């Protein structure tokens, strides 16, 4: 488990941002998990249609689009090959005598993608349908106005952890450590009512508040109605975390850099700014640093020859056990 790294792990579905990336421009390039998967892609928008295309020229492999822009065509800067905004080959100089040109293979390949509201996911491997992966999240939170959530780059972060990616996920997948590691967070949550379940490649954890302040105003027909839900934590296997609070959403993407180094990208989406520093969704920087400290301690400890492995708490480590089963299933 702990040695899975790079493309061996992060080859499935990936959150890459939201439709606001194409609000001013109709072309937005990026690289899928740079340093691991290293797949150049470009999002394009034609009318209301959003596509994800390979950003590699089918002629000689050059990156086609270097910057977000507004354009009618995609043009390779190496030899001038042009593509329509939908990726189809449009024009290539000095190719008049080439037989069977252009063909399907000269178009920019499409990369499968899907959306939940404004959220965009790349489907990089068909081991699991995106609908299956985010289905439990959509079902539980379909009432939330995701379209109103606004990305805030100033509140977004990148953290570097000196520990294996799986250890970081292990820690995220249980609330067992909250009373011991997160003293402030523990003051806001009812520890005995903390809920965890594994559903279809997803782990859901629900934090229940000690009072009804700073909790979700749930619809009367919702399955959690009547509970003081302070946070919904969704883990989408193998490396995405969607944390919903009354103020909005924090998306965390786990990026293994080496067997003992992990990078965590935080994407912050604000819904109700006035609730930002209240309840379970407050002090997220502090909570993250507390998690990093304990996970780095585990990384040091598991190197000991005296340590083999521990057993699972059937009550408190449901998510960790489910995560390990999914790794065995897919890898």
PLM feature segments, named:
Residues 1, 19, 61, 80, ...:
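Generic secondary-structure boundary/loop-capping signal
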Residues 12-15, 23-24, 92-97, 234-238:
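Short Pro/Gly-enriched beta-strand edge/turn motifs at strand-loop
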Residues 1-6, 10-11:
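Single conserved hydrophobic/aromatic residue that forms the stacking wall/gate
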Residues 12-14, 62, 177:
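Generic structural signal for secondary-structure transition and capping sites
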Residues 23-126, 135-138:
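Rieske [2Fe-2S] iron-sulfur-binding domain
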Residues 16-18, 66:
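General beta-strand structural signal in soluble alpha/beta enzymes
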Residues 23, 44, 55, 114, ...:
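C-terminal catalytic domain of Rieske-type non-heme iron oxygenases
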